[in-house]
From Swiss-Prot:
The species this protein was found in: Champsocephalus gunnari (Mackerel icefish)
Catalytic residue list: 192
Highest classification ranks of the organism: Eukaryota, Metazoa, Chordata, Craniata, Vertebrata
InterPro entries, sorted: L-lactate/malate_DH, L-lactate_DH, L-lactate_DH_AS, Lactate/malate_DH_C, Lactate/malate_DH_N, Lactate_DH/Glyco_Ohase_4_C, NAD(P)-bd_dom_sf
One cellular component term from this protein's GO annotations in UniProt: cytoplasm
GO molecular function: L-lactate dehydrogenase activity
Keyword terms, alphabetized: Cytoplasm, NAD, Oxidoreductase
Major site of localization recorded for this protein: cytoplasm
Functional pathway: Fermentation; pyruvate fermentation to lactate; (S)-lactate from pyruvate: step 1/1
UniProt name for this protein: L-lactate dehydrogenase A chain
Subcellular location: Cytoplasm
Enzyme class: oxidoreductase
Binding site for NAD(+): 29-57, 98, 137
Length: 331
């Protein structure tokens, strides 16, 4: 008799039970690992699967996390074979070529499209009913690519979009007003990146419109120079990359925030990347961030934002820029 047999006596034979809230993270780079740890520490799933083509790095990261199993409630698995991801509820894609210092997000594009041609069909094969969340940059274009390659309905393919930009925006407004970001309501929509659109008309604290108090807010003629805050949001990622080589923690927390809304069926509104054709005068098949409701079925609703003419024009310009790149892609 083995030690195990001496210690434990069986009462019944267990039938294998599938995971009820499995999440997969594709890519164990800085963003993938920050997303993984954020998801684990928020206790969002009963199983976390990780995949990557770099086998040693993957093995090391999985082992390192498994060594902390005592402090977690989640089963952690990893393999370069996508069968490990089978029956995931949410699949988070962070894999891709990393943005170099000074490189625009749009520049990355074709490099990452080629990587997606391998990843997406594998996800679809093993988790045909999952909600696909794209984080890799340029996120809006790659969400479109993932949607096209997966054949999924649009409500099951979302991009992390401007969820992080809006968080940065709210943090910086909070710094200026000496308030917690959760009390500063503000939205950034459009492209995640250089042509994102701050909705100054909607910025409020406790329902008090800041533009109502300062009609010049967000314009060139504003003596308080609020416009600089949006510039800081846009430059924020480049600044972090310049200082530490990559961004990870904030985007990881942002991903976990989105995963939580889906897994817990929260019906919470987030600015995430979705198909905006036909909204705000956008004519082309592009994905941009607008406020969306996230729940168990994915992206269930879109909120109709009241945008000023100037804001709408910026959004359309974003869409044109993205379409210009998209139509050149070989899918």
């Amino acid at each position: 008799m083995s030690t195990k047999e001496k210690l434990i006596s069986h009462v019944m034979k267990e039938e294998p039970v599938g995971s009820r809230s499995k999440v997969t993270v594709v890519g164990v780079g800085m963003v993938g690992m920050a997303s993984a740890i954020s998801i684990l520490l928020k206790d969002l799933c009963d199983e976390l699967a990780m995949v990557d083509v770099m086998e040693d790095k993957l093995k090391g990261e999985v082992m390192d996390l498994q060594h902390g199993s005592l402090f977690l409630k989640t089963k952690i698995v990893g393999d370069k074979d996508y069968s490990v991801t089978a029956n995931s509820k949410v699949v988070v894609v962070t894999a891709g070529a990393r943005q170099q210092e000074g490189e625009s997000r749009l520049n990355l594009v074709q490099r990452n499209v080629n990587i997606f041609k391998f990843i997406i069909p594998n996800i679809v094969k093993y988790s045909p009913n999952c909600i696909l969340m794209v984080v890799s940059n340029p996120v809006d274009i790659l969400t479109y690519v993932a949607w096209k390659l997966s054949g999924f309905p649009r409500h099951r393919v979302i991009g992390s979009g401007t969820n992080l930009d809006s968080a940065r925006f709210r943090h910086l407004i909070g710094e200026k007003l000496h308030l917690h970001p959760s009390s500063c309501h503000a939205w950034i929509v459009g492209e995640h990146g250089d042509s994102s659109v701050p909705v100054w008309s909607g910025v409020n604290v406790a329902g008090v419109s800041l533009q109502g108090l300062n009609p010049q807010m967000g314009t060139e003629g504003d003596g308080e120079n609020w416009k600089a805050i949006h510039k800081e949001v846009v430059d924020g990622a480049y600044e972090v990359i310049k200082l530490k080589g990559y961004t990870s923690w904030a985007i990881g927390m942002s991903v976990a925030d989105l995963v939580e809304s889906i897994i817990k069926n929260m019906h919470k509104v987030h600015p995430v990347s979705t198909l905006v054709q036909g909204m705000h005068g956008v004519k082309d098949e592009v994905f941009l961030s607008v406020p969306c409701v996230l729940g168990n079925s994915g992206l269930t609703d879109v909120i109709h934002m009241t945008l000023k003419a100037e804001e709408e024009k910026q959004l359309q310009k974003s869409a044109e820029t993205l379409w210009g790149v998209q139509k050149e892609l070989t899918l």
